[in-house]
Amino acid sequence: ETGRIHHGGNFQAMAVTNAMEKTRLALHHIGKIIFAQSTELINPATNRGLPPSLAASDPSLNYHVKGVDIATAAYAAELGYLASPVSTHIQSAEMHNQAVNSMALVSARATINSIDVLSMLVATYLYNLCQALDLRALQAEF
């Protein structure tokens, strides 16, 4: 109505940066839960009668999902690394003409990486679940 435009100059896009950081942290927590469940599934002390490492044959010779467990641990650790904030790494640019710069794109790219890692973690967990289900079916008595 007044003919004036008020612009806050929000080129830093901290709202987007922070939203992506919180999203990555949530993905990390989901990954930690899946890792814990996967660990309990392959551990004979917590899996209610399934063989160690979900081995279908002799558990002392067959370490079926040991490698998968190592991968899930690596994925969970990587999710923790990726959950770190990027907003603390803002640098001055243009000979200090731009004192603060947007980290929104960097944060979004890190979130995409987190989604990829979480997808691999979920895939390994689903593999373990399928193996456990097959072993339970072999144990079933009718």
Swiss-Prot record:
EC number in record: 4.3.1.24
Keyword list, A-Z: Cytoplasm, Lyase, Phenylalanine catabolism, Phenylpropanoid metabolism
Pfam families associated with the record: Lyase_aromatic
PTM description: Contains an active site 4-methylidene-imidazol-5-one (MIO), which is formed autocatalytically by cyclization and dehydration of residues Ala-Ser-Gly.
Binding site for (E)-cinnamate: K66, E94, N97
Pathway where this protein functions: Phenylpropanoid metabolism; trans-cinnamate biosynthesis; trans-cinnamate from L-phenylalanine: step 1/1
Job description of the protein: Catalyzes the non-oxidative deamination of L-phenylalanine to form trans-cinnamic acid and a free ammonium ion. Facilitates the commitment step in phenylpropanoid pathways that produce secondary metabolites such as lignins, coumarins and flavonoids.
Name of this protein: Phenylalanine ammonia-lyase
Source species: Agaricus bisporus (White button mushroom)
Classification of source organism: Eukaryota, Fungi, Dikarya, Basidiomycota, Agaricomycotina
